[in-house]
Structure formats: structure tokens, C-alpha cells
């Protein structure tokens, strides 16, 4: 099971957890969870006017062995309006535009989608239950 929590945070709300949303999916091959502005495609939906987030921004996909990966999907623009970082424990790393990374099996962490022009972000926490 992969559990996701999401909080949309703007400068004045930094540190607040109000308005968190959650989604989960069983660890079955082909299971998918998406994060973005499109409520028809995404289980976790960001504010519609936050254009630094694509319609479908992040895709979590369960592989054939029950492990999960996340992809920062390429949008319609050649250069993204945001940056994405993956934090697991005390280690944080940037996630490249269009890149895919495996999530730790049985682990937890956070993906931060940071607007490049304003102090706001979308914080997506994950927990992979074994």
C-alpha cells in the first residue's frame, strides 16, 4: 500500500498542516496515483490557479515486483515553472524534469514541488506500507 498526503503551502501558511488531503493505492503492479491540477486525472489535486504545477505533475506507479516509483512528468512547456525535491530521512535530492526515481521499499519521505517565482509549494508525503 502506498499512502500519500498533500498540503498546498503558500508563504503566509508555512508550517501549517490545515487542508491536507490523502490518497492511497494497493501495491499491485500497474497501480497509479497522480498529483496535479486536473481533478479528472489526479487523486491529489492542487489549486487550479497554481500554474507552476502541471495538470498532471507527479505520477506514482507500482512496478511488477510491488515497489513504487515516482516520475516528474514533462508538461507542455520546455522549461518547468517549478523545482521538485525528494527528501528521505536526512537526505534530499533534486528530481529532474521528466526523471523517474524508485521510492524506498517500506519507507517514507516527501516530495516538494516548489514554485520558482513565489514562496509557495506543494508538499507530498509518502509512506510505503509493506
Put a short name on every predicted segment.
Residues 71, 129-130:
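Generic signature of intrinsically disordered, low-complexity segments enriched in small/polar residues
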Residues 1-50, 61, 100-129:
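Intrinsically disordered, low-complexity acidic Ser/Thr-rich regulatory segments
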Amino acid at each position: 500500500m502506498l499512502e500519500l498526503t498533500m498540503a498546498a503551502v503558500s508563504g503566509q501558511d508555512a508550517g501549517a498542516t490545515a487542508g491536507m488531503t490523502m490518497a492511497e493505492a494497493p501495491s499491485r503492479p500497474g497501480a497509479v496515483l497522480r498529483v496535479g491540477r486536473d481533478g479528472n486525472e489526479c487523486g491529489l489535486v492542487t489549486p487550479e490557479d497554481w500554474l507552476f504545477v502541471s495538470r498532471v505533475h507527479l505520477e506514482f506507479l507500482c512496478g511488477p515486483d510491488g515497489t513504487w516509483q515516482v516520475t516528474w512528468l514533462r508538461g507542455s512547456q520546455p522549461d518547468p515553472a517549478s523545482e521538485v525535491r525528494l527528501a528521505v530521512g536526512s537526505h534530499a535530492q533534486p528530481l529532474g524534469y521528466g526523471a523517474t526515481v524508485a521510492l524506498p521499499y517500506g519507507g517514507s519521505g516527501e516530495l516538494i514541488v516548489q514554485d520558482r517565482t513565489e514562496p509557495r509549494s506543494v508538499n507530498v508525503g509518502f509512506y510505503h506500507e509493506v
